UniProtKB/Swiss-Prot annotation:
Belongs to the TrpF family. Pathway: Amino-acid biosynthesis; L-tryptophan biosynthesis; L-tryptophan from chorismate: step 3/5. Signal peptide: none annotated. It catalyses: N-(5-phospho-beta-D-ribosyl)anthranilate = 1-(2-carboxyphenylamino)-1-deoxy-D-ribulose 5-phosphate. This is N-(5'-phosphoribosyl)anthranilate isomerase. It comes from Saccharolobus solfataricus (strain ATCC 35092 / DSM 1617 / JCM 11322 / P2) (Sulfolobus solfataricus). It comes from the Archaea. GO terms for biological process: L-tryptophan biosynthetic process. Its EC number is 5.3.1.24. It is an enzyme of class 5 (isomerase). Transmembrane segments: none annotated. Keywords: Amino-acid biosynthesis, Aromatic amino acid biosynthesis, Isomerase, Tryptophan biosynthesis.
């Protein structure tokens, strides 16, 4: 079954509500480049209230800093393309099994996708540019070769069934379920959960 990650959570009330639903991962962005940014201390606070796996998301981070970041979260997502030296360094750490690497959904990044898969267990194929929908054709092609990828990028209630039919490892959803950046629409999240976990056309 496809797993579900709700990302960009910035309020404790949302996180507590989602922890009661059939959501597999809760993403929290601790990088100031995002309008959904929260301080790292928020992660420690959240862990007191929920047992669901927490994903700490950053764009700007040094590989040497990740081990410390993982002290307050279950997984760490690096949402940028790494250079070869960073990938090699990441391979040397035991905690790389708790790392999620971002790969832009473009055929130009096919080689990088292969290197990312060789480095970590969890890889997210997402939009090339912020605010742009993920390229369905690229995702479909990548998943034929690597069926254990996660997929994100403007996935909404209107198009989610198309992505479920591709049977990715997980779907990463954020902006399409927001009232405003960082604040989610609980009813919309419930609809997403219903489709992914119980009501998708591909599972009927």
């Amino acid at each position: 079954m496809v797993k579900l990650k709700i990302c960009g959570n910035a309020t404790l009330s949302d996180i507590i509500e989602f922890s009661k639903l059939d959501v597999d991962y809760l993403g929290i962005i601790t990088d100031v480049v995002s309008q959904r940014f929260v301080k790292s201390e928020f992660l420690t606070f959240v862990k007191r209230y929920v047992e669901k796996p927490i994903v700490n998301v950053k764009v700007n981070v040094q590989i040497s800093e990740i081990e410390r970041e993982l002290l307050v979260s279950d997984y760490f997502q690096i949402h940028r393309v790494l250079d070869d030296s960073e990938l090699e360094l990441l391979k040397s750490y035991d905690f790389r099994k708790r790392i999620i690497l971002y790969v832009p959904a473009s055929f130009e990044y096919k080689k990088y996708l292969e290197r990312a898969i060789d480095t970590v267990d969890m890889v997210l194929v997402d939009s090339v540019k912020k605010g742009v929908g993920v390229d369905y054709n690229v995702v479909s092609s990548f998943l034929k070769d690597y069926p254990y990828l996660g997929v994100g990028g403007k996935i909404s209630i209107d198009n989610i069934s198309n992505f479920i039919d591709l049977n990715p490892a997980w779907l990463d959803i954020s902006s399409s379920i927001e009232i405003y950046p960082g604040k989610k629409d609980i009813n919309m999240v419930k609809k997403i959960v219903e489709v992914v976990k119980y009501g998708s056309s591909s599972n009927k």
